[in-house]
Design a protein with these regions (language model features):
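Cysteine-nucleophile amide-bond enzymes
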Residues: 1-188
Length: 188
């Protein structure tokens, strides 16, 4: 937000109106930039708790049942097989400089959303996914704006029970436990 000057600097997908779970390629622990990759986000936890006065917009896209199913299936696959995917740090920098660069299984947030929407047949984009910025979505005529304001004012967030801001020690402990669980699962 303060670095790029753009009004919106992050984008996520949701498959339900209450926004209980958001999906993106972003920070995995909710606080620090790395580790990053395909992640589930929750409006009542992590960085969303710490930055509640940032600009926020909610858009709806009407899609066919088939496109919805394909988008959800693709997203769930990427979440379930998160170890196969990485955050596209270099691609993010190049996108900011308007340079197209594709890496297999590497995504930044708007590239992730763009790929899911495009490959599911839900939306045709005006430019390649590697050049889509979060703020570009505000300009797409297919999207209907449902809310524009601060994150704290988002109606779906106001109805949620807010979690506590975790300490950094607790955060890294949770990340470490998640990594250990992930390794154990792969052994069986």
């Amino acid at each position: 937000y303060s670095l790029t000057g753009a009004q919106y600097t992050h984008i996520s997908l949701a498959f339900d109106e209450d926004l209980s779970t958001l999906y993106s390629s972003t920070r995995k622990n909710g606080y620090t930039m790395f580790p990053a990759g395909p992640s589930r986000e929750y409006l009542n936890r992590g960085v969303f708790l710490m930055r509640e006065n940032i600009p926020c917009a909610l858009y709806a896209l009407e899609v066919t049942d088939e496109a919805y199913t394909r988008a959800k299936r693709r997203t769930q696959h990427m979440m379930h097989h998160g170890e196969l995917y990485r955050f596209n740090s270099l691609g993010l920098l190049l996108c900011w400089m308007h340079i197209r660069w594709q890496r297999r299984r590497h995504y930044f947030c708007s590239q992730f959303v763009s790929e899911v929407l495009q490959k599911s047949g839900a939306l045709e984009l005006p430019k390649p996914s590697t050049l889509m910025h979060p703020s570009d979505y505000a300009e797409l005529p297919e999207l209907r704006c449902l809310y524009r304001g601060t994150l704290a004012g988002l109606p779906q967030r106001q109805s949620m029970e807010l979690g506590e801001v975790e300490s950094v020690m607790g955060l890294y402990l949770n990340v470490l436990l998640g990594a250990v669980k992930g390794r154990v699962r792969r052994l069986f």
